[in-house]
């Protein structure tokens, strides 16, 4: 028999969190509570390749551009964030086609199939991202994943900071986590 806490996933009570998934259909918003899935819906129709969140912001890597939305603007309440049924207003940032996005120290990072890594200051609101200024951080192998200041690329793992992208080792990095953990074609490694 479900407990009261488990039933709350279907209401607007506390204890729920909205997570975002990148899919071929678009960005899917899912309300979860512990191990239960509640309400879900498509937040943005596009070919989403990666999604990242930081504070109220949701960034999406697509085949056309990097898109950003402000979850707090969706319901007019700066103290809360949007749920799956709230419409998010995604705006293009001008990066171009991207394979991965991530946030690090108040900045949005993006990478593409050509290995270009760019950094953009996190906006005060998503609407200002339409005029975002991207700074090229470095060039690596095809970018596959970004988390924090780490980039997983076809030719290894890179640390990104103000001085650029520095090779941190390994080859054929498939995914990265700021722990720092790296998934490669030959196994899982801790940097």
Where are these regions (language model features)?
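Acidic, polar-rich N-terminal leader regions of halophilic archaeal proteins
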Residues: 1-191
């Amino acid at each position: 028999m479900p407990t009261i806490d488990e039933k709350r996933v279907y209401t607007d009570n506390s204890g729920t969190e909205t997570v975002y998934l990148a899919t071929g259909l678009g960005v899917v918003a899912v309300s979860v509570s512990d191990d239960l899935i509640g309400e879900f819906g498509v937040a943005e129709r596009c070919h989403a390749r990666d999604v990242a969140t930081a504070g109220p912001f949701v960034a999406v890597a697509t085949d056309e551009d990097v898109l950003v939305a402000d979850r707090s603007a969706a319901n007019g309440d700066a103290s809360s964030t949007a749920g799956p049924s709230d419409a998010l207003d995604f705006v293009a940032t001008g990066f171009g086609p991207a394979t991965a996005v991530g946030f690090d120290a108040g900045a949005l990072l993006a990478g593409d199939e050509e290995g270009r890594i760019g950094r953009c200051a996190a906006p005060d609101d998503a609407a200002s991202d339409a005029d975002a200024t991207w700074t090229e951080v470095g060039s690596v192998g095809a970018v596959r994943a970004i988390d924090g200041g780490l980039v997983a690329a076809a030719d290894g793992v890179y640390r990104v900071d103000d001085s650029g992208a520095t090779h941190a080792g390994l080859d054929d990095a498939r995914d990265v986590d700021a722990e720092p953990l790296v998934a490669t074609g030959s196994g899982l490694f801790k940097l």
